[in-house]
């Protein structure tokens, strides 16, 4: 292993999903019931074929065992900024007569209350891949021990109800806690796959509940602007952050009648330049391009030079507006052109730009 230095930092460390944690803990609890083995580590097989040892913080009978067994592990998200990192994910398993697996939401795991997700209303928020992982591991364990019955599996997350408030679950209609997630079993640092998945879920839930006008917003200020402008409810507001591309591309699979995209002027200027990831590490504000666009609308040489020399995009648009050059509208028109290249023609797209006070300073339809 090489030594980490400022010039050569160590690679970012991957972690494991809550689905992997649930699989390991349910397997350990079931093994205790069927084989009497108290496990310190549970080895699981991930969907892509990797065998992973998951350390446990407890594995014990509940009562004298008549009520089942439980096991827990500490969620390790690696170097990903995951809200569940360090939380204890646990499973309580009870043997039942009917073959198969019954899933329950324990403390800290949410319940689906709105249509549009991959799970029916009323089901615990344990996603399909984690369900399949648990079912396969438990079926293999049952076969090893010639057990013909089934399992009732309750998954919980300590502190999950509070952690869920930091996620999109309440807006998606997943109430009471977190979702048990994962498609590969592995968390890739800063992959943002979970965030993008939640954007898609937000769109799907809104459509399933009859909303035909959605507003995709970069943050709280743009959400407030869309609430004030259109009176849209929270379910129709899609918190996209920097991932405007995730919204626009999803329209191909899940179109709506009307899509309003709203963000800060700087973010919208990046979209106008063709960037679909608006984060500063992946795209930057092109002041030269803003000056050129202003020139096309009558900006003189002095204003163009001022825009090129501006410290921020907000300063650039303020300079332009002070001389009656509608740079906010110009940027929105270019952003709209980019969006229309992606979304299907039946989606009526519009753009809104706001300033730092949350006031609308540009629009295009």
Curated annotation (Swiss-Prot):
Protein family (similarity comment): Belongs to the CbiD family.
Query: Which pairs of positions does the record mark as disulfide bonds?
Result: none
Q: What EC class is this?
A: transferase
- Record's catalysed reaction(s): Co-precorrin-5B + S-adenosyl-L-methionine = Co-precorrin-6A + S-adenosyl-L-homocysteine
Name of this chain's protein = Cobalt-precorrin-5B C(1)-methyltransferase
- Kindly indicate whether the keyword Zinc belongs to this entry: no
Give one GO biological process term: methylation
Provenance organism: Paraburkholderia phytofirmans (strain DSM 17436 / LMG 22146 / PsJN) (Burkholderia phytofirmans)
One MF annotation (Gene Ontology) recorded for this entry: cobalt-precorrin-5B C1-methyltransferase activity
**Any transmembrane segments, and where?**
none
The EC number(s) attached to this protein equal 2.1.1.195
Transport: present as a keyword of the record? no
Q: Which Gene3D superfamilies match?
A: CbiD-like
Q: In which pathway does it act?
A: Cofactor biosynthesis; adenosylcobalamin biosynthesis; cob(II)yrinate a,c-diamide from sirohydrochlorin (anaerobic route): step 6/10
Spell out the SUPFAM superfamilies in the cross-references. Answer: CbiD-like
InterPro entries referenced in this protein's UniProt entry, alphabetically? CbiD, CbiD_sf
């Amino acid at each position: 292993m090489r030594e980490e230095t400022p010039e050569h930092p160590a690679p970012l460390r991957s972690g494991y999903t809550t689905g992997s944690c649930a699989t390991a803990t349910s397997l350990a609890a079931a093994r205790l019931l069927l084989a009497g083995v108290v496990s310190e580590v549970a080895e699981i097989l991930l969907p892509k074929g990797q065998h992973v040892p998951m350390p446990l913080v407890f594995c014990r009978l509940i009562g004298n065992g008549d009520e089942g067994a439980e096991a827990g592990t500490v969620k390790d998200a690696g170097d990903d900024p995951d809200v569940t990192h360090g939380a204890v994910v646990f499973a309580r398993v009870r043997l039942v007569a009917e073959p198969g697996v019954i899933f329950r939401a324990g403390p800290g795991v949410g319940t689906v209350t709105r249509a549009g997700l991959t799970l029916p209303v009323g089901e615990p928020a344990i996603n399909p891949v984690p369900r399949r992982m648990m079912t396969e591991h438990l079926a293999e364990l049952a076969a090893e021990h010639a057990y013909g019955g089934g399992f009732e599996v309750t998954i919980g997350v300590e502190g999950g109800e509070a952690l869920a408030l930091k996620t999109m679950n309440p807006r998606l209609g997943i109430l009471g806690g977190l979702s048990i997630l994962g498609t590969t079993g592995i968390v890739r640092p800063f992959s943002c796959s979970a965030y993008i998945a939640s954007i898609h879920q937000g769109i799907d839930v809104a459509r399933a509940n009859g909303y035909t006008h959605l507003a995709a917003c970069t943050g709280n200020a743009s959400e407030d602007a869309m609430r004030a402008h259109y009176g849209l409810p929270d379910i129709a507001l899609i918190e996209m952050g920097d991932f405007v591309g995730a919204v626009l591309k999803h329209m191909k699979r899940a179109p709506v009648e009307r899509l309003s995209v709203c963000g800060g002027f700087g973010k919208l200027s990046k979209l106008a330049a063709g960037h679909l990831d608006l984060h500063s590490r992946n795209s930057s504000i092109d002041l030269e391009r803003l000056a050129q666009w202003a020139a096309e609308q009558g900006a003189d040489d002095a204003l163009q030079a001022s825009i090129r020399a501006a410290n921020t995009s907000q300063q650039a648009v303020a300079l332009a507006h002070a001389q009656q050059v509608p740079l906010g509208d110009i940027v929105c028109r270019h952003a709209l052109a980019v969006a229309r290249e992606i979304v299907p023609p039946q989606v009526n797209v519009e753009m809104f730009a706001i300033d730092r006070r949350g006031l609308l300073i540009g629009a295009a339809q």
